[in-house]
Amino acid sequence: MDKAAVVVRTRKVLTNRLLSRKQFVVEVVHPGKANVSKKDLKTTIAKLHKVADPETIFLFGFKTDFGGGKSTGFGLIYDNLEIAKKYEPKYRLARAGLYTKPQTSRKQRKEKKNRLKKAGKKTAKK
């Protein structure tokens, strides 16, 4: 990431004590460049907010303005990783590499679906 060309700003910083995190809006100005990667943004925001572990930062919901050059998104900084794993949705944890979905076989999924359908018919008759 070229430091001179990219400017990262955080607005509307709120401290959410109930969920043990900081919430903020991230503005990235990147003229003449494609979008900046979230990995680069995490390291920049970690330095900006003096965060020891960049793994506790979650960035999402980025929209690039028409014509490019500026993106706006949302960010969360949790106090520690355990709290982040407790409150973050599983899909965001999976994006960060902190969660893997247990994979069942196709046959098991189909059998479960059919069992549930069968159980639903029995309760509907009564």
Curated annotation (Swiss-Prot):
Residue stretches of biased makeup (Basic residues): 104-126
GO cellular component, one term: ribosome
Presence of keyword Nucleotide-binding: no
Region annotated Disordered, chain positions: 98-126
InterPro entries the record matches: eRP_eS24_sf (IPR053709), Ribosomal_eS24 (IPR001976), Ribosomal_eS24_CS (IPR018098), Ribosomal_uL23/eL15/eS24_sf (IPR012678)
Keyword Metal-binding carried by entry: no
SUPFAM superfamilies in the cross-refs: Ribosomal proteins S24e, L23 and L15e (SSF54189)
Keyword terms: Ribonucleoprotein, Ribosomal protein
GO biological process assignments: translation
Family: Belongs to the eukaryotic ribosomal protein eS24 family.
Cited HAMAP family: Ribosomal_eS24
Record's protein name: Small ribosomal subunit protein eS24
Designated gene of the protein: rps24
